[in-house]
């Protein structure tokens, strides 16, 4: 049991280290976009990405950056009215193909909000339709059962 716990932690650490070379000009551009945002930082994502999004929004708010989480399914049904052209939207999707997230993209474009994608697939539809893409993909999840998105959610944080 201890060995399995150590292996899991090592896999998580390795996944984070995979990101180091990807802290590049895209990362700098995303930070600049957020710092220059005259509105709020809106985070969206489904499932586990949504849980990470809620945590990110809370962290932004704690550090003085106006932020909130927008559930994309609720966005489809009217909550996009909370988003303005002054906002930056960060959309999280490991696959970059999450239907609910992709469904709100045309409306976000019409509103005029800027869009940062955090994806595990830099060639995905979400990545291709964003202003800035951050590739946070991992080569392996740390879940010993192969069921839970462990390393990918840690990388997104």
Range-by-range predicted roles:
Residues 1-36:
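An N-terminal, well-structured beta->alpha segment
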Residues 39-46, 50-157:
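Glycine-rich phosphate-binding loops that contact phosphosugars or nucleotide phosphates
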